[in-house]
A protein has these predicted regions:
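Active-site nucleotide/adenylate-binding loops and adjacent lid/helix of ATP-dependent enzymes
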Residues: 1-58, 69-73, 99-111, 115
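Pocket-edge structural micro-motifs
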Residues: 19, 32, 54, 78-81, ...
Length: 202
């Protein structure tokens, strides 16, 4: 708890408390004031490692996702645009998770994404990097050695007319001979089990 107080004192509120390991915004806390800090202390199990980060007041999140081969070369990359942030979805159960694959990527996002992948030096892995998109730049949120969650790989496949798990298998066993991607937009929208919707899935 002493480290929490040191972090709050050094970084100043508002902050985001995010676990070292996790998916989406699960077990993530927004610390706006002292009451939030005390609540976080009470709910923290005392063993899970957390990062304290300055809170960025921005609702636009984009990703740089893809796969690297055995030498660390990127064999494909794409980008997801979130309609709602993961934290908004966690805090507001009236919202549904909606995102789309962007066909035309900003060169600056690609540059930042490629530099991030190179810096971590990973091999034979998917990567999923999240950024806040500001008016004219990007702020890195997190780097994950996995695909984006939920239906993301299905959306990758539909948008690019391929099977990325097959591509991963070919990369892993050394039979990958390149990828001819037919890039399109792709959209995913999820539904909450406990809500009634006007239209059915069909």
């Amino acid at each position: 708890e002493g480290d929490i107080e040191k972090g709050v004192k050094k970084l100043k509120l508002p902050l985001i408390a995010k676990p070292d390991n996790g998916v989406g915004a699960s077990a993530t806390y927004k610390l706006k004031d002292k009451k939030d800090v005390e609540n976080f202390k009470k709910e923290w199990d005392g063993t899970t490692h957390y990062f304290l980060e300055p809170f960025v007041d921005n609702s636009d999140i984009v990703t740089f996702d893809g796969l690297v081969d055995a030498k660390g070369n990127i064999v494909f990359y794409t980008s997801i645009v979130y309609y709602h942030t993961p934290l908004d979805l966690l805090n507001n159960n009236t919202l549904d998770w909606v995102y789309y694959i962007d066909k035309d990527l900003d060169p600056k996002l690609v540059e930042y994404g490629k530099n991030s992948v190179k810096a971590f030096g990973m091999k034979e892995r998917f990567f999923h990097i999240e950024f806040f998109k500001t008016k004219d730049d990007y702020i890195a949120i997190e780097y994950n050695n996995r695909p984006a969650g939920a239906f993301a790989v299905d959306v990758y496949n539909f948008a690019h007319s391929t099977d990325y798990f097959r591509v991963y298998a070919e990369v892993a066993n050394g039979t990958f001979n390149g990828l001819n991607v037919d890039e399109k937009y792709g959209l995913a929208s999820t539904r909450r089990d406990y809500k009634d919707y006007v239209h059915s899935d069909e």
